[in-house]
Amino acid sequence: MDTLAAIGRWLSKQHVVTWCVSREDELWCANAFYVYDPDTVAFYLLSEEHTRHGQMTGQRAKVAGTVNGQPKTVALIRGVQFKGEIRRLSGDEEARMRQRYVKRFPVARMLSAPVWEIRPDEIKFTDNTLGFGKKLHWRRDAGAEQA
């Protein structure tokens, strides 16, 4: 099984990411609709800079987060935990990803919030549909492993 492909297929079917940032001794989390790009292994989202999490992020920050479904039974639990970096996009890169975001979420056409990229360095995918407690791990610098 191609671990990253399996993770990517599942992430492409979801739409809400929880991401957390810190500054000094303060932590804060936010939720956002996202577009997942399997080529860059990254999430793209819109978020205002004036929010608490936007202020804490600045132009770039370390980030951790989750994506999870809402299954009715333990046997169907699937979810991702990740850590990496979040950065604000600009110029052509922002325009390109905004276009892709608006294609998936047409209501976003009305929003002027900046586009952000969450680029995970590490992903852990729990997939109980493959067996209770089955974990797939991916690291940007190392590829894939299973547990």
From Swiss-Prot:
Superkingdom classification of source: Bacteria
Database matches in Gene3D superfamilies: Electron Transport, Fmn-binding Protein, Chain A
Sequence similarity: Belongs to the UPF0306 family.
Name this protein carries in UniProt: UPF0306 protein KPN78578_35330
Organism ancestry: Bacteria, Pseudomonadati, Pseudomonadota, Gammaproteobacteria, Enterobacterales
